[in-house]
Amino acid sequence: MGDSSKKVKDSFDTISEPDSFDEPKGVPISMEPVFSTAAGIRIDVKQESIDKSKKMLNSDLKSKSSSKGGFSSPLVRKNNGSSAFVSPFRREGTSSTTTKRPASGGFEDFEAPPAKKSTSSSSKKSKKHSKKEKKKEFKEIHADVLRVSRIYEKDKFRIILQESSSTPLILATCSYNRGSDIKFGDRIHVDAEVCKKSSSGDVTEIYIDRVLKNKENGAKSGIRRHSIAKKPFCIKPRFIHELSDTKIKKTVVQVNLLDLNLDFYAGCSKCKHSLPEAANQCEFCKDSQGKSELSMYSRVRVMDFSGQMFINVTTKNMKKLLDLLGYEGFDNWFRFKDPQERQNYVFRPVMVEIEKSNDEWECTDVAEVDWKDFGSYLKHKEDKKKRRSKKKHP
């Protein structure tokens, strides 16, 4: 028993040595501040806390060597009957010394830059705001009317104007109520919003806000109706397959002639209905001034890359079409009906303006194709289609 008691006492003496706690004997505890590198976090440990912890541990161990109770943790100290945990990492004061370590691995103090805020949404809002606040430009314009076309699907009119012979053409848009009284050959004075200008600063596109004055047939003499085949297009050209949209009542298409059936008859010079040569008055229009004249009726089959269709052509526009094909004058019109003449017009390209009436398309104007303007329009249309596709499928 004496030997065992001596061994226990020697072991307690060994534990009581301050240098032997938690370290092999002879290895001193580092008194330098301890740093934890986990997740790049630095913890500054004050030397005062380490000294206090060391004294507390030594006193607990010495008191325990003479105590009969159970072994208590050296990190728990009794103070006035209550247990208090004393950490060697305790920091006094309210200031925090915990900071993130720089990416370079150094421990020097630094201030992290503030988080960057997304500027994409704010920039979009600022652009929209600037567009809304962009001051609209209004201008009073005096111009001749070179063409008027109704856009049924949008219930508005598109009008080609020209201020003078030396100025560029102006494409004007207006509501149905404002444009219903405007006709080809009028001279109008309007207050309009400027939509587009040329590189030289000339107005090229407007929206008519008010019609201040409309002088009927007041345009300068010698003006010609603007062609449906030239820019700016009063009605934008379409393809045949697009005409399945029932909202479209009037449009322009570039087609090739396939077949043409031409009939001559004596008709009223006013309403074009058939009229006997001996009649003094047309029973349809009741116009005593109506005279019997040679009239034509034709039904033409045409095509483009997207399909085929039939178009009815009245006398006025049939004469214009025959002139384009090289058949001028009364005698040549009759010769056109010969079967061998068909080779002169089959697959000939033309630009036609058509309007829907009683579920059939009727030609209201015809012109020779301007390939430069039409090609430029097709390129612009294709580019616009690609931009829309990119927005839908970025």
Curated annotation (Swiss-Prot):
Composition skew (Low complexity), residue ranges: 56-73
Bias type Basic and acidic residues, positions: 1-12
Region (BRCA2 repeat-like region): 28-62
Region: Interaction with rad-51-DNA complexes, residue numbers: 60-89
Ranges where the record places region Required for ssDNA binding: 371-389
Domain of life: Eukaryota
Residue segments, region Disordered: 1-30, 56-136
A single MF term (Gene Ontology): single-stranded DNA binding
Any single Gene Ontology cellular-component annotation: nucleus
Biological-process GO terms, alphabetical: DNA strand invasion; double-strand break repair; double-strand break repair via homologous recombination; double-strand break repair via single-strand annealing; egg-laying behavior; embryo development ending in birth or egg hatching; meiotic DNA recombinase assembly; regulation of protein localization
Record's subcellular location: Nucleus; Chromosome
Effect of disrupting the coding gene: Mutant animals are egg-laying defective and exhibit a reduced brood size and high embryonic lethality. Impaired formation of rad-51 foci and accumulation of rpa-1 foci in the meiotic region of the germline in mutants either untreated or treated with ionizing radiation (IR), indicating impaired DNA double strand break repair by homologous recombination. Decompaction of chromatin, chromosome aggregation and aberrant number of bivalent chromosomes during meiosis.
Gene3D superfamilies membership: Nucleic acid-binding proteins
Predominant cellular place of this UniProt entry's protein: nucleus
Comp. bias regions, Basic residues: 124-134
Mutagenesis / variant outcome for changing residue 35 to A: Abolishes interaction with rad-51, but binding to ssDNA is retained. Loss of D-loop formation in the presence of rad-51. Loss of inhibition of ATP hydrolysis by rad-51
Tissue specificity note: Expressed in the germline, with highest expression in cells undergoing oogenesis.
Note on domains (UniProt): The BRCA2 repeat-like region is required for rad-51 binding.
Function of the molecule: Required for the homologous recombination repair of DNA double strand breaks, thereby playing a role in chromosome integrity. Acts by targeting rad-51 to sites of DNA damage and stabilizing rad-51-DNA filaments by blocking ATP hydrolysis catalyzed by rad-51. Promotes rad-51 mediated displacement-loop (D-loop) formation during strand invasion between the invading single-stranded DNA (ssDNA) and the homologous duplex DNA.
Assembly and interaction partners: Interacts (via N-terminus) with rad-51; regulates rad-51 recruitment to sites of DNA double strand breaks.
Protein name: DNA repair protein brc-2
Organism field: Caenorhabditis elegans
Lineage, uppermost ranks: Eukaryota, Metazoa, Ecdysozoa, Nematoda, Chromadorea
